[in-house]
Amino acid sequence: MRQCGLVRAAQLLRTCGLAEWHTPYRALSSLPDEKKELIKNGPDLQDFLSGELVDKSSWAAYKGDLKRQKGERLRLPPWVKTEIPMGKNYNKLKNTLRNLNLHTVCEEARCPNIGECWGGGEYGTATATIMLMGDTCTRGCRFCSVKTARNPPPLDPDEPYNTSKAIAEWGLDYVVLTSVDRDDISDGGAEHIAQTVSMLKERNKTILIECLTPDFRGNMKAVETVAKSGLDVYAHNVETVPALQRHVRDPRANFDQSLNVLKHAKNVRPDLVSKTSIMLGLGETDEQIYSTMKALREAGVDCLTLGQYMQPTKRHLKVEEYITPEKFKYWEKAGNELGFLYTASGPLVRSSYKAGEFFLKNLIEKRKTKAI
């Protein structure tokens, strides 16, 4: 569960010539033309690197090691260092969360973009990813800093109402709902998530809702419950390449199970936008990355994000390699060539980072066009 400025108009999907990859997969015809257009006009890599980054002129001159040697710990390269902007939006959002006893993956997973997403600039869009079902997970993935326990506290029955109330107070047009894994509950919390989505839609029929879900231990009925709840984007992260699944994720998770979750959500609701994320820098090879991207496209996944793995604490997996911005740009092009409708690839990209802005920009433009 690796979640992860002003909106700048930029087109992501453009003609990309990768000599070795000739045949792009066709974009899914099941998506309505309106949603395809919204995704097509999303931001590019620079939108995900916007904010107060250090001087980029130092990037090329950086001579530090990018691959970890045995017994060593890598130093942070300049392109993953960023100032954390705080402001009125940040403080307002944080206070609202505390007052309503809500949690965000932004805080629990120690996301490096929390200041930018929550701050949103004085005129930007504040984005937060609400983490449902408490702050304690039943799984222990080696990359994640969220608290774990075999038997977390029971679900808060008021959480769906409080969440919808908070979103109404913020006046957001797009919200991301994620959750901890709750293997201690028969349906993994699917009904709780679905109820939250339903209440949000009751308060605001036009709000766009993305759910970043658990794998529900392969319970496809639970997947179906969430998929049919009224959400707009169904997201579930495969996290890493198949070869590293056992090393990186909890033993109860695996690549095929995650892929089946994404497939089933689309089978149930072909009009849904499906989305997943991969962390880089865990020791994967280029061949493994490309093979994974290809498998995701063949499974019908619409959107893909790729970001740098960052070790949250010394107890977690060490970073094996820091991927350069140029290499992330390479994978963005690869994703476009494979036919993903939306590929976000950059060092600080997270699956939920500023998630709504590419939708919001286009919705605003569309409304202006209708008004003329």
UniProtKB/Swiss-Prot annotation:
EC code(s) of this entry: 2.8.1.8
Instruction: Identify the residues that bind [4Fe-4S] cluster 1.
Output: 106, 111, 117, 352
Pathway assignment reads:
Protein modification; protein lipoylation via endogenous pathway; protein N(6)-(lipoyl)lysine from octanoyl-[acyl-carrier-protein]: step 2/2
Q: Which BP terms in the Gene Ontology apply to this protein?
A: lipoate biosynthetic process
Ranges where the Radical SAM core domain occurs: 122-341
Statement: the UniProt record of this protein carries the keyword Metal-binding: yes
Listed InterPro entries: Aldolase_TIM, Elp3/MiaA/NifB-like_rSAM, LIAS_N, Lipoyl_synth, rSAM
| GO molecular function annotations of the record | 4 iron, 4 sulfur cluster binding; lipoate synthase activity; metal ion binding
What UniProt keywords are attached to this protein's entry? 4Fe-4S, Iron, Iron-sulfur, Metal-binding, Mitochondrion, S-adenosyl-L-methionine, Transferase
Instruction: Kindly give the NCBIfam families that the UniProt entry links to this protein.
Output: lipA (TIGR00510), PRK05481.1 (NF004019), PRK12928.1 (NF009544)
Protein name in UniProt: Lipoyl synthase, mitochondrial
Species of the source: Xenopus laevis
List the taxonomic lineage. Eukaryota, Metazoa, Chordata, Craniata, Vertebrata
Gene name, Swiss-Prot/TrEMBL: lias
